[in-house]
Design a protein with these regions (language model features):
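Residue-identity detector for glycine
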Residues: 2-5
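Helicase motor core with emphasis on the C-terminal RecA-like subdomain
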Residues: 7-11, 15-24, 28-32, 36-48, ...
Length: 290
């Protein structure tokens, strides 16, 4: 980020953070506990953040990564969302990249070279890739601004989203004790938060729990009767011109529903695990841009 180097180091951390928020991300002010979290992590301390989806979790590590020397390493199990985040950051002028199984060898090598040369502000990486000896050895030679562990509830062995690799992320504290860490989740009760803190060695981290009141979100339950007609009416009458996601219970249902909507003049794309990576990436990109 070219503009950050011109900020006077005599400015307070809060002023610098607000400058980045406004000039890079385009928001006039922080919301809720964002400013406090950003201050904490940017000053080199650890945090555990529980915040609803859409509550601004990403800014809590993106801004500290831009304020601190080096590259922020973001651990995420959601490969599809990595591309979204990197594309959105690139449009803002932030030097971001990702490493995951969707890339071919040449793409991964280009990203690794950029990291080694200090050309990245943020690197999104899947936990299984991060935990390889090769990757950890590479990080030993890199200036790391922070570690952000997204979807931190995946460390809980009692949760539906348990990922065994997440338990091994305690190595980040052991191997890089001077690098601040921020663990983030939108799904964790008090017991799960304690488990996250224990397994990731974040017992001393400051915990932030945001309100989950989301007045802009509502559930509507409709009795099933001629499902396709109901879906069509819902889209045309309540969400004409909007973008949306239709969840189905099987891959075949995804394909059938996509075909039906297109036949009705509603542009729709399929997305499921049975599709090749290139097609999923292309459909995801089109959904975000068209």
């Amino acid at each position: 980020m070219g503009g950050l180097g011109r900020l006077s180091m005599t400015n307070s951390l809060r002023e610098r953070a607000l400058h980045v928020l406004q000039t890079v991300f385009g928001y006039p002010a922080f919301r809720g506990a964002q400013a406090e979290i950003v201050d904490l992590v940017a000053s080199g301390q650890d945090a555990l953040v529980l915040m609803p989806t859409g509550g601004g979790k990403s800014l809590c590590y993106q801004i500290p990564a831009l304020l601190r020397p080096g590259c922020g390493i973001v651990v995420s199990p959601l490969i599809a969302l990595m591309q979204d985040q990197v594309d959105a950051l690139a449009e803002l002028g932030v030097r971001a990249a990702f490493l995951n199984s969707s890339q071919d060898f040449d793409e991964a090598m280009r990203t690794e070279r950029a990291l080694r040369r200090g050309e990245l502000d943020l690197l999104y990486i899947a936990p299984e890739r991060l935990l390889t000896s090769r990757c950890l050895d590479m990080l030993d030679d890199v200036t790391i601004a922070l570690f952000a562990i997204d979807e931190a509830h995946c460390v809980s062995q009692w949760g539906h989203d348990f990922r065994p690799e997440y338990i091994r992320l305690s190595v980040l504290h052991e191997r890089y004790p001077q690098v601040p860490r921020i663990a983030l989740t939108a799904t964790a009760d008090a017991d799960t938060r304690n488990e996250i803190a224990e397994r990731l060695q974040l017992q001393a981290a400051r915990q932030f729990v945001a309100s989950f009141d989301r007045p802009n979100i509502r559930y509507q339950i409709v009795e099933k009767d001629q499902v396709r007609r109901q879906l069509l009416e819902f889209i045309r009458e309540e969400h004409a011109g909007d973008a949306g996601i239709v969840y189905c219970l099987s891959r075949k249902k995804v394909e059938d529903t996509t075909e039906f909507l297109n036949e009705q003049g509603i542009r729709a794309l399929a997305y499921h695990a049975g599709m090749d990576t290139a097609t999923r990436t292309r459909h995801q990109s089109r959904f975000l841009r068209e």
